């Protein structure tokens, strides 16, 4: 589990996060919500050590993040950024990169590493893409490949920055279903999301940021009931109870 305690973070001359206390819990999908520029991506980058904190604590299974090596962090936390380069390699080779934290120098992949790639691609429903160049794949197909890479990393916490952006509705639902499966397998899944109804339907908990501070945190029902979403976004988010549970929409 990752714990953020009174976290402060930002960039030279530009503080972003202030006094954020939050937990990424195993077995749960956490949606990180908030307007553009409120610090969502900064939160994820600080939580896995890509961006140094300026105050507070980041604890990984009770251990301060700065006390872990880069390899140890990578074995604990997988991170899928919003923007990624598209290297001139096959999808299978890209997924194999998830095994880097477990290799010694010089890097030599073992039979079990290749088997893990096969299983991960099968898990995300992309086994047929293994030999195809990454550059030839659609956005939805690439998203599956990146998720498979994160699975081969075997990290108990998965951070995803806007994984549904630019995907059609069907692919968005596939990503959310995959997040749910991962949580059911015991992982902590943290997703920065812009689609509020999608987030509220698909997540267990929600963390709402506003101007770098935590405006609300709790179950999606608790955050909805707080009225903070309407205040922060300036929209009217409503819900209706159906046979399949609460459905959210803009009123």
What residue ranges belong to the model's regions?
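The feature captures the beta-strand-to-loop junction immediately N-terminal to the Walker
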Residues: 33-35
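Helix-to-loop junction immediately C-terminal to a conserved catalytic motif
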Residues: 48
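Conserved ABC transporter NBD signature motif
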Residues: 56-64, 73
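Conserved ABC ATPase "signature" region
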Residues: 96, 111-129, 154
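Conserved ABC ATPase signature
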Residues: 108, 133-137
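Catalytic Walker B motif of ABC-type/P-loop ATPase nucleotide-binding domains
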Residues: 158-162
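ABC ATPase nucleotide-binding domains
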Residues: 231-251
């Amino acid at each position: 589990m990752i714990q953020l305690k009174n976290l402060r973070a930002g960039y030279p001359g530009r503080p972003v996060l202030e006094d954020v206390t939050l937990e990424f819990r195993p077995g749960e999908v956490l949606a990180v919500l908030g307007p553009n520029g409120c610090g969502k991506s900064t939160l994820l980058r600080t939580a896995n050590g890509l961006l140094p904190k300026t105050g507070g604590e980041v604890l990984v299974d009770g251990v301060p993040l700065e006390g872990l090596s880069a390899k140890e962090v990578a074995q604990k936390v997988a991170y899928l950024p919003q923007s990624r380069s598209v290297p001139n390699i096959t999808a299978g080779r890209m997924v194999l990169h998830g095994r880097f934290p477990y290799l010694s120098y010089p890097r030599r992949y073992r039979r079990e590493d290749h088997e893990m790639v096969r299983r991960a691609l099968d898990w995300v429903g992309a086994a047929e893409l293994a030999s195809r160049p990454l550059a030839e794949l659609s956005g939805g197909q690439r998203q599956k490949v990146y998720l498979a890479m994160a699975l081969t990393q075997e990290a108990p916490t998965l951070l995803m920055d806007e994984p549904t952006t630019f995907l059609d509705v069907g692919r968005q639902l596939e990503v959310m279903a995959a997040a749910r499966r991962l949580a059911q397998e015991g992982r902590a899944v943290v997703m920065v999301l812009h689609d509020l109804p999608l987030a509220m339907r698909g997540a267990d908990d929600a963390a709402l940021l506003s101007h770098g501070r935590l405006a609300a945190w709790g179950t999606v029902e608790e955050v909805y009931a707080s009225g903070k979403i309407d205040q922060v976004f300036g929209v009217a988010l409503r819900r209706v109870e159906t046979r399949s549970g609460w459905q959210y929409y803009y009123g």
